[in-house]
């Protein structure tokens, strides 16, 4: 497990504990459970991801801690529509406020303007956050192994399945993958190619960890996919699912950037 103290991830997790305490004061778990009843049905994130090749989770992200504001002209509704028209399988929507300038309401806004399922991209630390994600109209949650204990991973993934949410479990190395594989096979596996300490990107991380998986297990490669050659490299190693944000957000037309990178995905 990567030690996250003195890293940006460590700072984010510290802030998330403060945020959780604040949110619990404003709305307790029972209130959030009531709120869930108003949410529309889930759209089937994993099913949609598997239905296309390449299966692309296209990210709606205004800023990042390392790059600052990536997209000043930020319109989640318009971006969601463009992604759907380009052939994305799913959306990833940042809800973290302090580090990524996201917003909770962006999930519902994006979903209202397209038919794609959405991942709540945030740093979740408690089952409360999972139930909250369902209330916010997410179809899938992200669990980052580097900032969660085995008990948290187990408890939060079970909570997600109870609320019909899909789960994307993110790992950075072999040790984290070993922990992730203890969870239900229903979980999707994501490999983040970015080193949390140096922020360097190495696409070989995905290739290396893919070899340790059963060939039938779907793997999502995350971070650093920037050229058609990167996509081809992954596909040559039987990796057909991608999470891409920055490459799209930096361009005036995210849909055109999508097509330049992936072409037109096909139904499988």
UniProtKB/Swiss-Prot annotation:
Pathway: Amino-acid biosynthesis; L-tryptophan biosynthesis; L-tryptophan from chorismate: step 4/5. GO terms for molecular function: indole-3-glycerol-phosphate synthase activity; phosphoribosylanthranilate isomerase activity. The keyword Repeat does not apply. GO terms for biological process: L-tryptophan biosynthetic process. CDD domains: IGPS. It catalyses: 1-(2-carboxyphenylamino)-1-deoxy-D-ribulose 5-phosphate + H(+) = (1S,2R)-1-C-(indol-3-yl)glycerol 3-phosphate + CO2 + H2O. InterPro entries: Aldolase_TIM, Indole-3-glycerol_P_synth, Indole-3-glycerol_P_synth_dom, Indole-3-GlycerolPSynthase_CS, RibuloseP-bd_barrel. Its EC number is 4.1.1.48. This is Indole-3-glycerol phosphate synthase. The gene is trpC.
């Amino acid at each position: 497990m990567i030690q996250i103290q003195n890293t940006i991830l460590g700072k984010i997790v510290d802030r998330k504990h403060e945020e959780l305490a604040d949110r619990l004061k404003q709305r307790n778990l029972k209130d959030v459970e009531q709120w869930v009843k108003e949410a529309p049905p889930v759209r089937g994130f994993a099913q949609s991801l598997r239905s296309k090749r390449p299966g692309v989770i296209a990210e709606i992200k205004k800023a990042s801690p390392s790059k600052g504001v990536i997209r000043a002209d930020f319109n989640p509704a318009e971006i969601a529509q463009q992604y759907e028209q380009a052939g994305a399988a799913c959306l990833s929507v940042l809800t973290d406020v302090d580090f990524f300038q996201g917003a909770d309401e962006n999930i519902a806004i994006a979903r209202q303007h397209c038919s794609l399922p959405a991942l709540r991209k945030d740093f979740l630390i408690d089952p409360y956050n999972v139930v909250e994600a369902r209330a916010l109209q997410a179809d899938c949650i992200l669990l980052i192994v580097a900032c969660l204990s085995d008990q948290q991973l187990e408890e939060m993934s079970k909570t997600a399945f109870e609320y019909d949410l899909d789960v994307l479990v993110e790992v950075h190395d072999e040790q984290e993958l070993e922990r992730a594989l203890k969870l239900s096979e229903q979980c999707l596996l994501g490999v983040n190619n970015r080193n949390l300490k140096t922020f360097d990107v190495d696409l070989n991380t995905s290739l290396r960890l893919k070899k340790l998986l059963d060939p039938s297990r779907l793997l999502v490669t995350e971070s650093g996919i920037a050229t058609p050659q990167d996509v081809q490299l992954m596909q040559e190693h039987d990796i057909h699912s991608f999470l891409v944000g920055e490459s799209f957000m930096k361009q005036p037309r995210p849909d055109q950037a999508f097509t330049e990178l992936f072409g037109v995905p096909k139904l499988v």
